C-alpha cells in the first residue's frame, strides 16, 4: 500500500449541503460546515489508523483498527457505533450505525483522497489534495 500518511486539503464539495440536510444537521452547524475548507490529517501507527479533520470551525479525530467497532460523534451530534474496513489497497469504508446508517468511503489516489459520504440515498463527494 502506498504511504497515505500526511495532510490533505479540501479541494471542493459536491452535494454536501443535501447530505447534511438528510443527516439532520442543524442550520448553524450546517452553515459553518459548508463554509470551511478542512484539512484531513492521516497518521498510521502500526495497525492503528488516525484520521483527523482540522478546521477553524471544528476539529475531530477517529482512532481505529480495521474491523474493530468503536464509538464516535457523528456530524449531527449523535453518538454512533462505527466500523472501518479496507476494500483493496487504497480504500477505507466506514459504516456508522445509529438511527441512520451512514457510509463514508475514503479512496486514496496518489496525492489525492476522495471522500464519498452517503445517507438515505443522498451522496456527497469531497476530493482533497495533498498539502
Curated annotation (Swiss-Prot):
Pfam family, one: Lipocalin
Keywords: Allergen, Cytoplasm, Lipid-binding, Transport
Record family assignment: Belongs to the calycin superfamily. Fatty-acid binding protein (FABP) family.
UniProt-annotated binding residues for (9Z)-octadecenoate: 106, 126-128
Compartments in which it is found: Cytoplasm
Cellular component GO terms, alphabetical: cytoplasm
InterPro entries found in the cross-reference section: Calycin (IPR012674), Fatty_acid-bd (IPR000463), ILBP (IPR031259), Lipocln_cytosolic_FA-bd_dom (IPR000566)
Protein name: Fatty acid-binding protein
Residues that bind (5Z,8Z,11Z,14Z)-eicosatetraenoate: 106, 126-128
Molecular function, one GO term: lipid binding
Function summary: FABPs are thought to play a role in the intracellular transport of long-chain fatty acids and their acyl-CoA esters.
Biological source species: Lepidoglyphus destructor (Storage mite)
Swiss-Prot/TrEMBL domain comment: Forms a beta-barrel structure that accommodates hydrophobic ligands in its interior.
